[in-house]
Amino acid sequence: MASSTDSLVDEHSLSPISHRTPLLPRHASDSDDEVYCSQTSRAHQVKSYIKQATASLRWTVQPFLPTNPPHWLQTTRPLSLPTVNHRSTSQAVFLGIWLLVNLALIRQSWSLSNISEPSHFPQPTKPEWLHCVESYWLKDDGCGLNGKDCSSYRNVTMAFRCPSHCGTSTGLLNPRVVGGEVANYQPLVVGGGGQGKRYRPDSFICQSAVHAGIVSARWGGCGVLKMLDETHGFSGSEANGIRSIGFPAPFPMSFTFLDNVHTSGCNDLWLTIILLNVACSAIFVLLLGPSPQMFFWVLSIVGYWIVPVASEPSSLPPSWSKATGNFLPFLFVCYWLWNVCWRDTLETISSLDRVWVYLGPWWFGVLMNLTAGWVPLDRLTPHDLQQRPGAFLALSILMTITAILVYHQACCLRKEKRFEKLAVPYAFLAIVLILLCFVPEHSLRIHHYLIGIFLSPLASAKTKISGVLQGFLLGMVQNGVARWSFASILEQTSEVIGDGYLSGDSMPEFDLEQSGLINGLKDLKVSWKSEGPDDRASLVGVMVNDVLRFIVPKINQSLIIHNFLNNLTSISTSPSPLQAAFNQVFFRLAFFDNKMNAEHRISEYTGPVTFFVNNQTWLGPTPVY
């Protein structure tokens, strides 16, 4: 009887006092209605207990680092100061010093460079900024017939400055023809070998300077470039981590770099600025104990500005107007991120744990061009995924990791009874993205800043993994907006491809069976088939050795180059001398129209066809896409 009573006590103690039933046995006079009420009361007790036991789960984040910091940390943290005002004052002073040191380094890095050279720049001169992929000579026929549109650069001498990271990490993103070779996903440097160290003028100047040892790939630098006249060939070589391409044929212009140059203030201080801010952010969190909200906004502001001034500037020198123009809308994005995912999670993580939970992943995201620049994914286009080595594998690995993390976060949010609120917005987002894929002549571009925004709500669970993801995704947003602005999610396909080849573009077709040496091996005949894309294609442009030399009627179906070894002329065009002897001749064709009495190219150029003079044979065309 006693054990039965104890059992009843345990069971009934789970319910409120108002619902408890008498512990003594019922009298025989009790009615059946009372029995029914007692059973109903017990059922209500069980139901109430189950409901309480299965209430919404709340994660408890256990601190990874000790709750009580070391003695030296306790004695130096302003948290131990007697008033909140003292702590706020110390934080304000530290932030002010942090800002002033950054401004001094930024000024030194961008505004104090000078260069001098005895013969051309005897007095210190401020150099001209160049991007890593700038060149004098434009792609294909960008310099016009016989290169006349670029002739003003002859004998030009220029003092220039290159930024950091102009080595193998940057280069071509679309195919570029150099003689009989098609280069892509590599630096564009033609020549530089041999005694003269001359480069073809379509070479990227800064990467050529790295190849020549004039500037540093890591720190940048200054130099003096001098344009020269025609060169009869360019030797390829490998130096300073860059492999240059050889070109065994004449070209109308070339350039070289002068020696005996004196420079000051030309090194890019990007690493010093980054290390300073990494150290200051850690000190600020460890020693000054900011509130969660202050912690978030300091990270938001510092991470945004570190990109245009140090890690990945969008213009040279940094464009303050562009950076400030994007800063205000970026702050609205940060306000949304704080309210949607950061606030609840950050408040559950201790100040010491925030260093490794947030700061490390956040810096990894802010410096994505440095930490993940080796991943072969610049544009998620079908061409890049098919042609670029390792691109498809890298995308597969990233998609797998993303899917695992999304599933984990969805499970965490489901346990917190918050996943249902996100299901409808994400379903609507998926429908919108699918519809955008079908917009004609446009491509869906999910930039990495959009990935950071889209995935942030899934990282709002109260776990340390969520904190890691929040820091990394915030860094992604900052890197994307500060470098590329708020780029559109929908872009024209031609803009995405840039100067690449459009699929389905109609190009002329060589007729090599009808081509070759004629008239006693003195003249060279180049033939093509007469088919064209439409009636507009009334002309054919002929590039010889990567220079547009002739524009002739398509109906002729051939071009005869008289005495081509000594004087490259045609009966159909004005003379265009090329006084040199060579063993290989490279040809490419494109369709032109004659609109408004001016020739306009209406197709891409074919791949190169090589004619070997020694054995009178043809090779090609080499595919370019």
State the predicted function of each range.
Residues C150, L328, Y449-P457, F472-S485, ...:
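Juxtamembrane/interfacial segments around transmembrane helices
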